[in-house]
Amino acid sequence: MRLSECIKGQTLIIKNNNIQDLKLKKYTMDIGLINNTLLKIIKSSNPIILKCRNCNLCISKDIAYDIICEAI
């Protein structure tokens, strides 16, 4: 399952050096806001793991950046 498919209606957990644990839900945030938030975190210098809670998708920073840019 692609990250863009997970974002729609799913909960995506973003762990940034185990310091941040953001839960982004489609029902509480506009899809554009989710994309912008992901872009800001992905562009940061810290290592990042994107993981979808429902399908256990883990994706690397570079791949995630490509997919998010494509989604926008």
Positions of predicted regions on the chain:
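A generic structural motif
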Residues: 7, 18, 42-45
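Absolute protein N-terminus
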Residues: 1-2
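C-terminal structural segments of small proteins and small subunits
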Residues: 42, 46-72
